Amino acid sequence: NPLRVKTKETPAALSPASPYSTLQADCPYYFMEWEGGVYLDPAYPYVRSLVADGAAEIVEKYEVDGIHFDDYFYPSEDPALDSSAYALYVETVETPLPLLEWRRANISALVAEVYQKVKKAGPQAVFGISPQGNISNDENMGADVRAWCAAPGYVDYLCPPLPLPGQRLHYQRYH
């Protein structure tokens, strides 16, 4: 998860010198806490750039074929997760998007920025995502797979996980 800083299994206190500790001290609103985990909040352009710059740095400094994200973005559908960021957004625009659409817009902006910076860092590098096998679940967690497939500038490929034995894959072809 490109937004996950730590899980409940991570030590309770990270090093005071860690990038998380430094940023959290200055800008605590850049983070969301959920079930013992801490996540970057993609509502903020700085956060999206931080993730995209990290992906570009990997492409620039290491011999990699590309960057791959798993399917998890927002850790929950719960409106309380990012309620303060959403409230700030609602106050600053004339016609705000509903919460789930706003979250999808944030993640799509993140995905597009990562794509652009990865391509700038290494034009041959690819960028892909493994979305969940159920489009509705993706949309509820912030992933707009349909939009990413419908327009250039988001991903080079999608690689949904194979279903477990006894499960059916719920993907349809979108072109």
Regions found by a protein language model. Give the residues of each.
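Active-site beta-loop-alpha junctions enriched in small/polar residues
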Residues: 1-3, 69-74, 132-134, 163-165
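Conserved, mostly hydrophobic/aromatic
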Residues: 51, 58, 67-70, 118, ...
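A structural motif
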Residues: 63-64, 155
